[in-house]
Amino acid sequence: MKTVLSLMAAALVVAAAIAAQAPAAVQQAPAPDAWRNFEGSLSASGQRQTLPTESGRPAATVQLSGPVAITAGEGLSRAFRSEAIGFDDGAGLTVLRGVWTDDRGDRIFTRLNGETVASGRRIAATITGGTGRYAGITGEYSFEWQYVVEAEAGAISGRAIGLRGRYHIEGTRK
């Protein structure tokens, strides 16, 4: 019995020594073209011009700009300047085109679709391309307008919450 316990103790010591010498698991970075998730927030202000329609809901053009803050994820700048222009036909079709520009001048281009720009409305976007380090980027994101405030003379401003998306960049660019 004493021999069995000695052998078991020796086996445990050997196993512990082997485990201590084993290389630690290396956490690999995602492949350059792997899908990567991101989260953030955005605020925007600009102008909205409206035109009456037969439905009673006005058609509108909108031009917005403001900061985008990326709060989670990797591979993107943490801050962008966002610009968007778009059209709401007054009958439920809203289409916008946007561009995010980082501090180096590299850009991400987007196409946005959704409901009228108003509080509580959701917007879905497709990332359609980029320049510089974002060349070859594609993906998608969405957000909800937490609030949209309209002031006199067509001025509009708002804050979006729940900005979440994913992207990948073709090839070896990061």
PLM features per residue range, with description:
Residues M8-A17:
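Bacterial N-terminal signal peptides
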Residues A22-K174:
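Beta-strand-enriched cores of mature, soluble protein domains
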Residues M1-A9:
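Bacterial N-terminal signal peptides that target proteins for export
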